[in-house]
């Protein structure tokens, strides 16, 4: 659109379709504007620029993958991710300045590119503004223990552990729980989770809300008392700051990307170990003083 201050292009990379056309248009725009720098909000952008490029890079599969995340992939997926990461690293080296969300990711960027740490700026994730306008007073409607488990329905979130967690809690005598998730109803992940819980005769222990607006999500948080973060790979999960804002004591996987954000305000467990996670929840549910200590640490 001529005369506009912004341009909308087809999603890239689209090597078999619009890529060459978009590449040519970007070169024309850069030549006309002659920018002092280019800021790639989602990087790498698959294009080269004459101006210095600042990349906003937030892909943990490239900067800090781990054995637990790799273990959930099929052989085909492992090959795909390996080749994908090689290409991402190649393109990252075209830039000399980066923005990311955590020190964990920043260290990975420096290791890959060889850039000094002062070339990588960490800008942390923040709480959605709408949450600050919503009353976060807890809502207690019954004697159920409600646990929020929020995130996109991606494999590395490790929501597949939920049935085993519920079974382990049941074995420990913690039966009055409900885990609240926000997985799209048509997604195969929730269908698998529900099937596993049905086989265990524990279907009543989970509530799937599907896609929620931020206001609806806030109301869900208000009705929960705890938060579960089973993720195996992150840069900075929004669920961490959301849970802290709503004062939900957290049980999370023990990784640098979690401990960097949550510090001592959380109980950690060995990744993929449902029994260990259940033991931490049992400890948390039984100890009101511990709950208050963790809540207090969230405010620091």
Locate each region found by the language model.
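Nucleotide-activated donor-binding/catalytic signature segment of Leloir-type glycosyltransferases, i.e.
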Residues: 4, 191-215
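Short hydrophobic beta-strand element within catalytic cores of glycosyltransferases
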Residues: 249-252
């Amino acid at each position: 659109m001529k005369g506009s201050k912004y341009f909308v292009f087809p999603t890239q990379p689209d090597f078999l379709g619009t890529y060459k056309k978009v590449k040519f248009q970007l070169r024309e725009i850069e030549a006309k504007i002659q920018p002092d720098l280019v800021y790639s909000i989602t990087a790498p952008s698959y294009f080269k620029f004459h101006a210095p490029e600042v990349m906003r890079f937030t892909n943990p599969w490239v900067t800090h993958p781990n054995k637990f995340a790799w273990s959930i992939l099929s052989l085909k997926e492992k090959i795909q991710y390996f080749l994908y990461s090689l290409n991402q690293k190649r393109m990252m080296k075209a830039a000399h300045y980066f923005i990311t969300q955590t020190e964990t990711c920043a260290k990975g960027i420096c290791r890959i590119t060889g850039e000094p740490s002062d070339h990588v700026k960490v800008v942390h994730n923040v709480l959605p503004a709408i949450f600050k306008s919503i009353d976060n007073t807890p809502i207690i409607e019954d004697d159920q223990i409600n646990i929020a488990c929020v995130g996109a329905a991606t494999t590395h979130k490790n929501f597949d552990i939920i049935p085993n967690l519920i079974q382990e809690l049941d074995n420990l005598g913690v039966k009055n729980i409900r885990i609240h998730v926000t997985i799209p109803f048509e997604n195969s992940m929730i269908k698998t989770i529900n099937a596993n819980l049905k086989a265990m005769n524990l279907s009543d222990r989970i509530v799937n809300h599907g896609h929620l607006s931020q206001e609806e999500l806030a109301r869900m948080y208000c009705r929960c008392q705890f938060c579960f973060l089973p993720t195996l790979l992150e840069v900075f999960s929004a669920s961490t700051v959301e849970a802290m804002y709503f004062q939900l004591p957290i049980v999370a996987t023990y990784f640098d990307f979690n401990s960097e954000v949550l510090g001592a305000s959380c109980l950690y467990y060995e990744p993929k170990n449902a029994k260990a996670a259940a033991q931490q929840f049992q400890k948390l549910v039984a100890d009101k003083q511990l709950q208050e200590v963790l809540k207090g640490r969230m405010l620091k």
